[in-house]
Design a protein with these regions (language model features):
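Non-catalytic pre-domain segments flanking phosphatase-related domains
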Residues: 3, 7, 21-55, 63, ...
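Bacterial N-terminal signal peptides
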Residues: 9-17
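C-terminal cap/substrate-recognition subdomain and adjoining C-terminal extension
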Residues: 23-32, 36, 41-43, 48-50, ...
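A generic alpha-helix surface/boundary motif
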Residues: 63, 115-116, 194, 263
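Charged/polar interaction segments and conserved charged motifs
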Residues: 13, 83-102, 333-334, 341-352
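A metal-dependent, Asp-based hydrolase signature
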Residues: 65-67, 72, 78-162
């Protein structure tokens, strides 16, 4: 009986040691970035905090929708004939020698305005069930080669190879480490919520985000048998969400709001996560789409981090200008100047 406490203590020590040994390290990060992230996590661990990440070009390399569209189009799964009539917004640019692709059509919608093509490239996958789309997403993620596509440069048809998403190993490490330390991880994507959930919440891709924590462009889902309509967002808010039971539902082209791009990302944090508690980390890669949540959400008073994936020199230049402008605006209004503080900036190759 006298040995029992000693044995219990020894077992406890072994258990703690094994937990420490199993703790995730940020091995696929530059050392200065890893140290900054480790310090932020240590300061905010197990206090009910949360982090928010963009997905395309932030959590994985390249873009899910922009590669899934030509992949499914090349397989004959998405065509002009299957496209919902509401998505035929302008005439196709056909010639005697060339029939314009839907991928090219998407590019031309972006030339009109991002506010046109951002929703369109989520809506274009309507008409399929989530189960069907999950199969195509998994096929896309397994590709080891780019997808051929065409687009217009003026009136000239150009060829393009579109890369499928490539998981950032560094980000899967960071997601895991945050969760290990009691910091909830949310995804805030300008892409289709249902499509991104198929990657972010599937354990085989390494992110392990709770399905309900994936927030994106939400489209009404339809039960083909009953005609009933719903969305994951509506179900989650009502406390009646089961991701698996939704897989037989059909994606429709009808948008739910808030729309999760530009200021809508910040609005979605307030709507779906917390109206007052700010995240201790926000990660992004696009100044216009991620800028609002990066500059307005991070709780710098807690040592919170602005995480930037520096994939384009012109975006970095734009972001530096935004830091300066926003810091000056904060100072002018007598607010704490946080816009130019606590930035962790890495290049895609450094976290691949």
């Amino acid at each position: 009986m006298k040995l029992a406490p000693k044995m219990l203590f020894a077992a406890l020590c072994v258990g703690l040691a094994s937990q420490a040994f199993a703790a995730t390290e940020l091995k696929h990060w530059p050392e200065p970035a890893a140290k900054a992230l480790d310090a932020m996590i240590a300061a905010n661990a197990n206090k009910g905090n949360y982090a928010v990440f963009d997905m395309d070009n932030t959590s994985y390399r390249f873009d899910l929708e922009e590669s899934l569209l030509p992949y499914m189009e090349n397989k004959g799964l998405i065509t002009r004939e299957t496209l919902d009539p509401s998505l035929k917004l302008m005439p196709f640019k056909d010639t005697a020698e060339h029939k314009e692709s839907l991928f090219s059509y998407y590019y031309r919608l972006c030339e009109v305005d991002d506010m046109v093509c951002y929703p369109w490239v989520a809506q274009v996958f309507s008409g399929f069930t989530l189960k069907e789309l999950k199969g195509y997403v998994d096929e896309l993620m397994a590709l080891d080669k780019p997808i051929p596509a065409t687009y217009y440069d003026g009136d000239t048809v150009k060829q393009l190879n579109v890369e499928p998403p490539r998981v950032f190993t560094g980000q899967t490490e960071l997601y895991k480490k945050l969760m290990e330390n009691g910091i909830d991880v949310y995804v805030m994507t300008a892409a289709s919520e249902e499509l991104v959930r198929m990657v972010a919440s599937d354990p085989k891709y390494g992110y392990n985000v709770k399905p309900e924590n994936v927030i994106g462009v939400s489209l009404l889902l339809k039960d083909r048998k009953t005609g009933d309509l719903t969305t994951a967002r509506k179900q989650i808010t009502a406390g009646k969400y089961d991701a698996k039971s939704n897989m037989g539902l059909e994606l429709t082209p009808y948008l739910w709001t808030p729309a999760t791009w530009m200021a809508g990302k910040q609005a979605a944090i307030l709507t779906y996560i917390d109206e007052w508690k700010k995240p201790v980390l926000v990660g992004g890669d696009t100044p216009t789409s991620d800028g609002y949540m990066l500059f307005h959400s991070v709780d710098v008073s807690k040592g919170g981090v602005h995480l930037w994936i520096n994939r384009k020199d012109k975006y970095m230049t734009q972001l530096n200008g935004m830091m300066k402008k926003n810091a000056e605006a904060q100072a002018k209004e007598g607010l704490p100047v946080t816009a130019d503080k606590n930035w962790v900036i890495v290049k895609p190759d450094e976290i691949q």
